[in-house]
Structures are given as structure tokens and as C-alpha cells.
Amino acid sequence: MKVNNSDYGTIIKFGNLELFLEKLKIEGKCIREIVNSIDKNGISLLEKSLISRKFDIANFLLDSGAKVNIISTDECNELHYLAANINCPGAVEVACRLVDMGIDLNLKEKKFGDSAIWSLCQEVLKKRTKEGNDLIVKCLGKRPDINDENKSGYSLRYLIEERGTEDMKKALEVMS
């Protein structure tokens, strides 16, 4: 990969943390100068790293002060983008960091009106793991809106009552 001719987003998508750091060095830039850069679709470097399953880069960006709750033109935040990859190694740890940093669990994306927590829960329930379950319970502890419906008329409450684990259902009861 030619680092000189590639932008940071391309390096994140097709490269690795080493190439990302090399690009910074070549351009003589400090990470703080570019950490919150966004592309024409409003997607941040952090979001690109989550989409591309480059969780080492995501952690580096978070350690370097990347902001959370950057909203793309599709009205998605970092958790929406991470949800599709939540069952990949390292994803839950990054998701926990985002939750601890105050990610907006209730933000609804434009196409289906799914909240970030809905998107996350839906993906976690496709491949049930203890760490995924614990993540949803942690999110429920932040008291997201469980009754708000997406464009299909389904709420987080409905999703958990129908398909959730016992731990999720218990956390839901505490909220009621």
C-alpha cells in the first residue's frame, strides 16, 4: 500500500496501525490534528476503524482523544457502525469503552429508525456470547429508552422480551 498517496480513511480500511502511524510521520502531523477528521459522509476516522474491524486503531484513536457521538449523514454514531461487527474479537471491549464515554444509545439512524442500542442488541442476539450479553446488560444500566419504536414499530423492550436472555430480561424489569 502506498501510504504517501492514501488518505487516512483508506489506510484504516486497507492498512493497519503501523501504516497509519507511518502516514502521520510522513505528513509531520500530530494525532491530535487529525483524530476527529470526518469525510464527506460525516464518517469519522474512529467510525471508519469500527466499520473496518480495526479495533487496535479504534483504541489508539480513543486513547488520543477521539470524540464520540459523531453523527454521519446517515444519522449513525459509532455504536451503529460497531454493531455489525460486535461478534468480532476485540469489538465488545471497544463498545464498553464507548458506553463508558457516554455514547448516545438512543440515537436513531435514518433508514430504519433503529437506535444504537437496538442495532447492538439485534446483532448480539444473533450470536449469543457471555460478553455480548454482559454488554447489553451494561447498556441497559444506562437506562436507554426501551419503549421508543423504530420505523417497523418494534421497541427495544419488545426485542428483549421476545428474544433476549434472562439477564437482559431481568435488567429490563429493573428499568420498569
Model feature map: region roles:
Residues 10-16, 48-54, 81-91, 119-131, ...:
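Ankyrin repeat A-helix N-terminal signature
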Residues 112-142:
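Conserved binding-pocket/active-site segment within a compact domain
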Residues 40, 47-55, 60:
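N-terminal accessory/assembly segment that mediates macromolecular interactions
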Residues 24-34, 59-67, 96-105, 134-146, ...:
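Ankyrin repeat domain, specifically the short helix-to-loop turn at the C-terminus of the second helix
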Residues 145-176:
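Leucine-rich solenoid repeat scaffolds
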